[in-house]
Amino acid sequence: MDMAILPAGVWGTALAVPASAAGRRVRLWRRTPGWAESWDRGHPVLPGLKLPENVVACDSAQAAVSDADLVILSPAGAGLRPVCRLVRPHLRPDAVIVCATKSIEPETHLLVHQVVEEELPGHRGRIVALSGPNFAHEVAAGLPTGAVAACPDLSLADWVQQALMTDRFRVYTNPDLVGVELAGALKNVIALGAGISDGLGMGDNARAALITRGLVEMARLGRAMGANPLTFAGLAGMGDLVLSCTGDSSRNRRAGLAIGRGQSAEAFLAETGLTVEGITTARAGWQLAQRLGVRMPITEAIYQVLYEGLPPLTAMERLMARPRAHELEEVAGADLKPPFDP
């Protein structure tokens, strides 16, 4: 099987590790001119990585994808449409597109696979999402990792599972494409909130409550969009959420910590140069919730901190002062409306 991964950023390069270990022929592409000639079979952010001979670098997107059976798109959310447009003239008609990006498009509120469908209409129905609790540096180091390949056509999800699965990179399948993509995007927002809570010194109890109630509102929006609520209890939901809310390598958690300690989001981004998907997804998620009439108080609070100048401490105090509520909600099929009087 021939596989292409674009771009060869940190995440794309890391994915070449299980792909090559599974015996696939992998072509990497990066926009930097001349990078293929100087490539050292690794990535500067992944120290010690040396990819094997079945991974090659390409200077053009055409060279990377023209013979590929499977094409993994791994840009940041803002780069998804440009990468799709770049590869569109060169894709094989039968190529399977794997989306490894976790975002919601800010202007349109489209999920990743919906953006790809617009840009690559000839591949509609041949799009698979790859998601889960995956820090790139751990995948690159060959540490044990679980992931999810999601597609309504389970035969395609199975095919991607087979293409990437190794004894260190375990891939599960799920037909719920919407749920898996939405979970991967929304967990970035909740991870920002967890970082803010920790930055304020709110403690472990508060973080645990925020993670759990954040999962509830993620599933609540998912259900309104036709997703299976149980997806949010799996690797793409709870798994990725726990990792992003607690792992020190989480960009969203790091940004939240800085905001909780008094730094603005703009200053954090300027200082670090990082892409923090949760900052743009907070607005898109909140706007989606408004449009669909879904209650997402944690997402709303984070949106207000980022875009309306609400002090982080005030946001946390407001969340704790909300009316009494039942824990079992419509996500679990219960018909209990807060406030609940015992």
Curated annotation (Swiss-Prot):
PROSITE patterns on file: NAD_G3PDH (PS00957)
Enumerate the catalysed reactions: sn-glycerol 3-phosphate + NAD(+) = dihydroxyacetone phosphate + NADH + H(+); sn-glycerol 3-phosphate + NADP(+) = dihydroxyacetone phosphate + NADPH + H(+)
Q: Which UniProt keywords apply?
A: Cytoplasm, Lipid biosynthesis, Lipid metabolism, NAD, NADP, Nucleotide-binding, Oxidoreductase, Phospholipid biosynthesis, Phospholipid metabolism
The family line of this record is:
Belongs to the NAD-dependent glycerol-3-phosphate dehydrogenase family.
For biological process, the GO terms are: carbohydrate metabolic process; glycerol-3-phosphate biosynthetic process; glycerol-3-phosphate catabolic process; glycerophospholipid metabolic process; phospholipid biosynthetic process
Enzyme Commission designation: 1.1.1.94
What is the source species?
Symbiobacterium thermophilum (strain DSM 24528 / JCM 14929 / IAM 14863 / T)
Pfam families named in the record: NAD_Gly3P_dh_C, NAD_Gly3P_dh_N
Where is it mostly found?
Answer: cytoplasm
Q: Which GO terms describe its molecular function?
A: glycerol-3-phosphate dehydrogenase [NAD(P)+] activity; NAD binding
**Can you tell me which residues bind sn-glycerol 3-phosphate?**
K102, G132, K187, D240, S250, R251, N252
SUPFAM superfamilies annotated for this entry? 6-phosphogluconate dehydrogenase C-terminal domain-like (SSF48179), NAD(P)-binding Rossmann-fold domains (SSF51735)
Protein's name in the database: Glycerol-3-phosphate dehydrogenase [NAD(P)+]
Q: Where is the active site?
A: K187
Q: Where in the cell is it found?
A: Cytoplasm
Q: Which sites bind NADPH? A: W11, R31, K102, A136, R251, E277
Give, as one word, the top-level EC class. Answer: oxidoreductase
Matches recorded under InterPro entries: 6-PGluconate_DH-like_C_sf (IPR008927), 6PGD_dom2 (IPR013328), G3P_DH_NAD-dep (IPR006168), G3P_DH_NAD-dep_C (IPR006109), G3P_DH_NAD-dep_N (IPR011128), NAD(P)-bd_dom_sf (IPR036291)
Which Gene Ontology cellular-component terms appear in the entry? cytosol
Keyword NADP applies:
yes
The free-text function statement in the UniProt record for this protein reads: Catalyzes the reduction of the glycolytic intermediate dihydroxyacetone phosphate (DHAP) to sn-glycerol 3-phosphate (G3P), the key precursor for phospholipid synthesis.
Taxonomic placement: Bacteria, Bacillati, Bacillota, Clostridia, Eubacteriales
Presence of the UniProt keyword Phosphoprotein in the record:
no
